[in-house]
Every structure is written in structure tokens, then in C-alpha cells.
Amino acid sequence: MIISKFGLGQQIRHKLLGFPGVIIDIDPEYSLETPTWEEISGNDTPRSEPWYHVVMEDNEGQPMHTYLAEAHLMKEELSEHDHPSLNELAEVIQRRAPQLRH
């Protein structure tokens, strides 16, 4: 059984880039068809660990959808950032999370 470190609606931060984000979906392992796993397998990211669909804001505050391995994420400390749109998205997802886990 694979256990994810982060949950739906949780605010996180990209370890390398520092971008803040909100988890909108979780896959127990890498599950995208494009790009293929072979195209990204040059890095040391494990395919069999949880992967997350994350909405992040770049340096200019623009939203972007990303697909990231658990190893690339760290818990966000709420007092560290000021991103109202991410705060709102996190609240909406957390309120609806019980309905999403059917």
C-alpha cells in the first residue's frame, strides 16, 4: 500500500524552484502517458511513489498546472507566503475533499 505524504488541498512548495502550490489530485504512482516514463527517467525520481497534480504560481504570479513527484515537494508553512488565489483554492478543495474521496 502506498501512502502519500501530502493531501488534497494542502499547500506545498517546490523544493528546487521554491514556487508555492496547492495539491489538486494525487496518483499513487506515475500515471501520465505523455511524456512517457522513458523520456523523464533520466532523473532519480521514483515512478512507484506518489505523484501530485499541483496548481502553482510562478515568479510572476501566473498559475500553472504541474505534475510532480513527492520527492520534489515540501510542506508549506502558511506564514511564509502571501498568495490569496492559492489560499482560496486550498480552502475550496479542502471543503470538497470528503466528497472527492468517494
From Swiss-Prot:
* Role this protein plays: Involved in the degradation of certain denaturated proteins, including DnaA, during heat shock stress.
Picking any one GO biological process from the record gives: response to heat
Q: Where in the cell is it found?
A: Cytoplasm
Q: Name one GO molecular function term.
A: DNA binding
Going by the entry's taxonomy, the superkingdom of the source organism is recorded as Bacteria
Provide a GO CC annotation, any one: cytoplasm
Q: Which UniProt keywords apply?
A: Cytoplasm, Stress response
Concerning its family, UniProt says:
Belongs to the HspQ family.
Record Pfam families: YccV-like (PF08755)
The name under which this protein is listed is Heat shock protein HspQ
Q: Which InterPro entries match?
A: Hemimethylated_DNA-bd_dom, Hemimethylated_DNA-bd_sf, HspQ
